[in-house]
């Protein structure tokens, strides 16, 4: 009985080691040693819509760091993976250009310990105007005071299922509103007429 238990323990250990050895770190990302695909982390503006099954682990024993990789439901696993924090990794050399997306839906989310969708924008005219203002407008400066309401707009495209392109929406006490990307620190003043069409709850 003890021999069987020991064999089971050894097999479990080998499985864990094998899984953890699948990914190696590189100067620019992670290498899947089984498929020989190299994945690079995208900017925080890109998020996985959900997390599927685990595909591998990178373990840095020296620093005690572990990164677990997962497939993204409905997304092409040969191109995109995610981790336990929802970060997106891409096997392509070039980051997706969200300005070229045919955006079909925008989730309006409240961000706290978890992200909760409070509204859903499916009106094509509103979606197109949000995209136009964000991608085509000149950069502005955020007000110095804190926003009274903060939402995260998650844009979805049928061309990239399972993946969101995200920007923040800040509403201030004086009624002004801004789109904002925390990674690039790009801020865009939202026209009042458009702000009235963005549901906050």
Please state what every model-predicted region is.
Residues 1-10:
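Positively charged n-region of N-terminal signal peptides that target proteins for export
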Residues 15-18:
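C-terminal motif of bacterial Sec signal peptides marking the signal peptidase cleavage site
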Residues 20-201:
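Function-determining sites in protein domains
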């Amino acid at each position: 009985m003890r021999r069987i238990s020991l064999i089971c323990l050894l097999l479990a250990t080998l499985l864990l080691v094998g899984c953890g050895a699948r990914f190696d770190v590189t100067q620019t990302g992670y290498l899947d040693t089984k498929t020989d695909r190299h994945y690079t982390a995208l900017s925080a503006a890109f998020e996985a819509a959900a997390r599927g099954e685990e595909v591998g682990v990178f373990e840095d024993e020296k620093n005690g760091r572990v990164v677990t990789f997962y497939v993204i439901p409905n997304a092409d696993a040969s191109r995109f993976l995610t981790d336990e924090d929802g970060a997106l990794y891409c096997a392509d050399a070039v980051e997706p250009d969200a300005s070229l997306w045919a955006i079909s839906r925008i989730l309006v989310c409240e961000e706290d310990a978890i992200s909760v969708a409070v509204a859903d924008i499916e009106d094509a005219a509103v979606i197109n105007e949000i995209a136009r203002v964000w991608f085509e407008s000149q950069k502005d400066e955020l007000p110095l005071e804190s926003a009274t309401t903060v939402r995260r707009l998650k844009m979805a495209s049928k061309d990239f299922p399972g993946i969101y392109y995200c920007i923040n929406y800040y509403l201030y006490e004086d009624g002004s509103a801004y789109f904002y990307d925390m990674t690039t620190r790009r801020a865009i003043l939202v026209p009042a007429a458009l702000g009235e069409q963005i549901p906050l709850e």
